[in-house]
Structure formats: structure tokens, C-alpha cells
Regions:
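HIT superfamily nucleotide-processing domains
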Residues: 1-233
Length: 233
């Protein structure tokens, strides 16, 4: 997937919506997440145990990997220092100042959403990329160096695989653009993993996880979970 053009990438990601609908029906779950390490495979993970009405679900277990462990995980990590976040921001931006367009199109129901506040510049942040319609910033609780969150400037449902095709395609296009920024940066990432999950904040968002060369150790394995516990891998 890392070698796909923007149009090809959007087309492939868009096709997962149809499969996700089939998975939902077959497994009788209200939500399905997407995980890909940007190789040849895209995983669609049914979120067993999640209720139909959105409620936040957070995994209390924290983790951090200095090198790629052989899998992706959406778990949070311990709070990173500002020095680490500043360096990661500089690496991704290649030392150039990142524009800060604070335009946000939240409605009255979502104006106090965490992401709305970040987009408007009301909270400390480490923005690494933006366009007229989307913003990408480092998460201070990343489980790997340079972990990035991408959000639209307007509120969209956090169940990304159920978004209308137009909104979904625009988001996928922004993901591709942000991935190119990360891969071409000084971060040293060979490719960038992608996760659609949406159970921490009720605002559509993509998690972009830089995948750098491993250190040759045997890849770790994540345990099988029968119900969703706040993270996917």
C-alpha cells in the first residue's frame, strides 16, 4: 500500500467500507475497526462488546516501543516529554514551521470536543501537517515515536467505516497526504501504519503510526481478546 498513488490509496481504503458492512452483519457488532501496517494486508476487526450508542472505551494498559515490535497497537503510551514531542514535530516538518490555521467547523453540540479545541489552538499541541479540511498532530501519549492523529476540521462521526463515501474519501485522501509528509520526513519511517477505531473521542480520526526498521529481534505477538477492551492491534 505504501507505493500506491493517492487515487489508488483512496480507492482501496474506500472498498473496505463494503467489506466492513458484511463483517458487521455477520458478527452482529455495531462497529468495525481498520488496521493496516501498509503492506499488502488490511485487517477489519469487529469490536465485540461495544454498544450501539457511542461511549468512550479506554484501554488502561500503556505501552511504548522504541522500535517496531512486529505489529501495530492503538494503545496509548506514557506521557511523552515536551522535548521528545518537539523533536518529533521538527523531524516530521523537516525543521520548517508548520502553519497553524485555527479554522474549525464544530457545531454547538461538538464545540467542546477535545479535537475541536485542538484545531482552534486552545490546547497545547504539536501540529505536523494541515490542509483546508484536515489537521494532523502528534499525540502526547503515543506508544511509538511520531505517532500522529489526523482529524477533519468539521465534526464527523467517529465510526469512520460508516461515513458517507464523500466524507470517507476526503478523509482517506488527507491520510495519504499526511503519510507522504511522514515518510519523506527526517523521522526515518519506511512506511506508516493506519488505524481507524474511534472509541476514545467521538470525532472521526485516523491514527498514523510510523514504522521504522526493527532491531532484528523476534516480533512480539499480541494476545487474542474475545471482547474489545479499548484498543486494537
Amino acid at each position: 500500500m505504501s507505493s500506491l498513488s493517492k487515487d489508488q490509496f483512496v480507492s482501496v481504503i474506500l472498498s473496505t467500507k463494503t467489506v466492513a458492512a458484511i463483517v458487521k452483519a455477520a458478527t452482529k457488532v455495531p462497529r468495525v475497526s481498520l488496521v493496516t501496517t501498509a503492506d499488502r494486508n488490511i485487517l477489519l476487526v469487529p469490536l465485540h462488546g461495544v454498544e450501539g450508542e457511542w461511549k468512550p472505551v479506554n484501554d488502561p494498559q500503556l505501552e511504548y516501543y522504541d522500535t517496531y515490535p512486529g505489529f501495530l497497537s492503538s494503545r496509548s503510551g506514557p506521557k511523552l516529554s515536551n522535548d521528545v514531542l518537539n523533536k518529533a514535530q521538527k523531524d516530521i516538518a523537516q525543521g520548517k514551521p508548520v502553519p497553524m490555521d485555527l479554522t474549525c467547523h464544530a457545531d454547538s453540540k461538538t464545540t467542546d470536543n477535545l479535537f475541536a479545541k485542538i484545531i482552534r489552538g486552545e490546547l497545547e499541541q504539536w501540529r505536523v501537517w494541515e490542509s483546508e479540511s484536515h489537521v494532523a498532530f502528534l499525540t502526547p501519549f503515543g506508544n511509538t515515536y511520531g505517532k500522529t492523529v489526523l482529524v477533519p476540521r468539521k465534526h464527523l462521526d467517529s465510526d469512520i467505516l460508516s461515513l458517507p463515501d464523500r466524507n470517507f474519501s476526503e478523509l482517506a485522501g488527507a491520510v495519504w497526504d499526511a503519510i507522504q509528509q511522514i515518510v519523506r520526513s527526517d523521522l526515518g519511517a519506511e512506511r506508516v501504519g493506519l488505524i481507524f477505531e474511534g472509541m476514545e473521542v467521538d470525532w472521526a480520526h485516523a491514527k498514523l503510526i510510523p514504522i521504522c526498521a526493527d532491531d532484528g529481534r523476534e516480533p512480539l505477538e499480541q494476545p487474542f481478546m474475545e471482547t474489545y477492551g479499548g484498543s486494537v492491534s
